[in-house]
Amino acid sequence: MSYLIPYVIEQTNRGERSYDIYSRLLKDRIVFLGTPIDDQVANVVIAQLLFLESEDPDKPVNLYINSPGGSVSAGLGIYDAMQHIKSPVNTTVVGMAASMAALLLAAGTGKRYALPNARVMIHQPHLSGVGGQVTDIEITAREAVKTKQLMAEILAKHSGQSVERILADTERDRWMSAQEAVEYGLVDEVLHPREKASRSAR
């Protein structure tokens, strides 16, 4: 199902200029990951991260996430780019960060945020479409075990949990509320609505 991407019209000294909404957000150093993660999506996100670093390596990048996860290899490509660039990457989950997207949320190199009703889910990598000769299946299974260990080590590094705890908790889908994600170490802070926060401070 396709949907229309909104355009924003801005006035410049040369007249009107239109941007698709994602390009306009990029001007403010905002990258939005709002789809399942595949190779094409990962390439776009990585390109945006590299571009923003080249623009100003000292300014933070804000990565907003609303994704059910997806390809492990594609997600690890985004993860490596986040760790590679000099610009700090703040991550914020809006809606959902599940599976590979939860790892990217936790791996923010700046601040890591969740909106109040966001959900976070971690689990072990899934095998799909496995077939062929027994030897090929054995090779795939060994690679899957290595990937499971790698993902657990990355989550442990960024959450402060032990690898053993991560492995145990990801045996099945582990869903968390925004506050539970803070307590688990995947998120630093829950962002509450600005107006209510400012009223309560009076």
Curated annotation (Swiss-Prot):
Gene Ontology CC terms: cytoplasm; endopeptidase Clp complex
InterPro entries xref list: ClpP, ClpP/crotonase-like_dom_sf, ClpP/TepA, ClpP_His_AS, ClpP_Ser_AS
Location of the active site: S99, H123
Transmembrane segments: none
Tagged with keyword Phosphoprotein: no
Cell membrane listed as a keyword: no
Superkingdom, natural source: Bacteria
Molecular function in Gene Ontology: ATP-dependent peptidase activity; ATPase binding; serine-type endopeptidase activity
UniProt EC number: 3.4.21.92
Gene Ontology biological-process annotations: protein quality control for misfolded or incompletely synthesized proteins
PROSITE patterns given in the database record: CLP_PROTEASE_HIS, CLP_PROTEASE_SER
Disulfide bonds: none
Catalytic activity: Hydrolysis of proteins to small peptides in the presence of ATP and magnesium. alpha-casein is the usual test substrate. In the absence of ATP, only oligopeptides shorter than five residues are hydrolyzed (such as succinyl-Leu-Tyr-|-NHMec, and Leu-Tyr-Leu-|-Tyr-Trp, in which cleavage of the -Tyr-|-Leu- and -Tyr-|-Trp bonds also occurs)
Top enzyme class: hydrolase
Gene3D superfamilies (UniProt xref): 2-enoyl-CoA Hydratase, Chain A, domain 1 (3.90.226.10)
One matching Pfam family: CLP_protease
Localization per Swiss-Prot or TrEMBL: Cytoplasm
The entry's keywords: Cytoplasm, Hydrolase, Protease, Serine protease
NCBIfam families for the chain: PRK00277.1, PRK12553.1
Similarity remark: Belongs to the peptidase S14 family.
Function: Cleaves peptides in various proteins in a process that requires ATP hydrolysis. Has a chymotrypsin-like activity. Plays a major role in the degradation of misfolded proteins.
Subunit and interaction comment: Fourteen ClpP subunits assemble into 2 heptameric rings which stack back to back to give a disk-like structure with a central cavity, resembling the structure of eukaryotic proteasomes.
Protein name in UniProt: ATP-dependent Clp protease proteolytic subunit 1
Organism this protein belongs to: Symbiobacterium thermophilum (strain DSM 24528 / JCM 14929 / IAM 14863 / T)
Source lineage: Bacteria, Bacillati, Bacillota, Clostridia, Eubacteriales
Gene that specifies this protein: clpP1
